[in-house]
């Protein structure tokens, strides 16, 4: 797939996508604030270091991290990178796909975020191996992707097609993939974007989104 032809300004404006057409930007503050609250406890022992957002889009997630960190972002979309730079002028951005050899040295990052990326890729396992290479031993990886269960299959089929979701993983498949690519699972859960903490608290597997916090081993 030619990702750069798919993820253009039209995709992020909602013309060629589903969730952006619903006003994704308006809900992003709540969504990314909730995500950061989950990640934040794992930053307590990382006073300084490098953070990478894989598939950073407009850079909303990087904005949540304190400036004491060196913040990096990659995305296949040149348009997205331009917008991310506006929101994060002190961060470093590169145009790159997660399935390609990532433009960073081995063992470079302390924390890597991969929010709603794997479902867009032809080979999510390759992307996780690439991420593993550039993450420091003991480094933290946060992954979020649609949970392909009965709820997702029946209620989100149109949305997934419109969003170009080509690799849909169940929650257990995501955990297995992380284990196979060299990560130790520290925590995992499923959730709904509108009821984030309900699913987080009760650890239900019926949420239509799946997430895991893992560590490089």
Features from the language model and the residues they span:
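A short glycine-rich, Lys/Arg-flanked "PGG" loop and its adjoining helix->strand segment in the class I
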Residues: 125-137
């Amino acid at each position: 797939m030619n990702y750069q032809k798919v993820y253009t300004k039209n995709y992020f404006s909602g013309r060629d996508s589903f969730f952006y057409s619903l006003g994704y930007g308006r809900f992003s503050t709540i969504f990314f604030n909730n995500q950061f609250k989950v990640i934040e406890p794992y930053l307590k022992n990382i006073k300084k270091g490098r953070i990478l957002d894989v598939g950073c889009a407009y850079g909303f997630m990087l904005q949540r991290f304190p400036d004491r960190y060196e913040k990096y972002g990659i995305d296949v979309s040149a348009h997205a990178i331009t917008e991310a730079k506006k929101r994060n002028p002190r961060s470093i951005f590169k145009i790159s796909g997660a399935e390609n050899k990532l433009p960073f040295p081995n063992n470079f990052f302390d924390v890597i975020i991969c929010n709603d990326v794997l479902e867009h890729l032809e080979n999510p396992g390759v992307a996780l191996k690439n991420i593993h290479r550039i993450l420091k031993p003991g480094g933290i990886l946060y992954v979020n992707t649609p949970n392909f269960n009965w709820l997702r299959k029946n209620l989100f089929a149109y949305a997934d097609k419109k969003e170009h979701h080509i690799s849909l993983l169940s929650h257990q498949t995501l955990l297995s993939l992380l284990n196979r690519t060299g990560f130790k699972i520290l925590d995992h859960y499923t959730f709904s974007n509108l009821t984030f903490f309900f699913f987080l608290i009760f650890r239900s597997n019926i949420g239509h989104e799946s997430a895991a916090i893992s560590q490089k081993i």
